[in-house]
UniProtKB/Swiss-Prot annotation:
It is found in: Cytoplasm. It comes from Shewanella amazonensis (strain ATCC BAA-1098 / SB2B). Its cofactor is Mg(2+). This is Ribonuclease H. One of its GO terms (biological process) is DNA replication, removal of RNA primer. PROSITE patterns: RNASE_H_1.
Length: 156
């Protein structure tokens, strides 16, 4: 088997109002190549955008890859590395027997991550990390651009 391509992915989500207009930003780096992704939604939450960013990034990869995925979202990182195992066992309910919020995105993230070898990393937000700052800018600009796209899974 050939060696997997090594990709670095940085992600961030933003929401103005929470709920409100939101956006995500992604920076993907492979060798000397760099790709940026961003999109906005008319009504969503910060957590949904924090989940959508890595989903879009991982789903955009055309083959299985060795991924280092860095985010400033403890919610996303802890959810995908710790909480999700229990949620799946319990039929997508939390320890307190309530339905998992954003289950549509958790299931998509789980499926997207399963195709790759992912090292989930956390970086403190707004601490001068260049790629994280760029993702923050992309996400915020997408949210501020008066997006009209509907986040179909958002439930108030």
């Amino acid at each position: 088997m050939s060696e997997l391509k090594q990709i670095r992915i940085y992600t961030d989500g933003s929401c103005l109002g929470n709920p409100g207009p939101g956006g995500y930003g992604v920076v993907m780096i492979y060798k000397q190549h760099r790709k940026e992704l961003a999109d906005g939604f008319a009504l969503t939450t910060n957590n949904r955008m924090e989940l959508l960013a890595p989903i879009v990034a991982l789903e955009s990869l055309k083959e299985p890859c060795d991924v280092i995925l860095t985010s400033d979202s403890q919610y996303m990182r802890q959810g995908i590395t710790e909480w999700i195992h229990g949620w799946k066992k319990k039929g997508w309910v939390t320890a307190s027997k309530t339905p998992v919020k954003n289950v549509d995105l958790w299931q998509r993230l789980d499926a997207a991550a399963a195709k790759h070898k992912v090292d989930w990393r956390w970086v403190k937000g707004h601490a001068g990390h260049a790629e994280n700052e760029r993702c923050d800018t992309l996400a915020r600009e997408a949210a501020e651009a008066k997006p009209t796209q509907i986040d179909k899974g958002y439930q108030p």
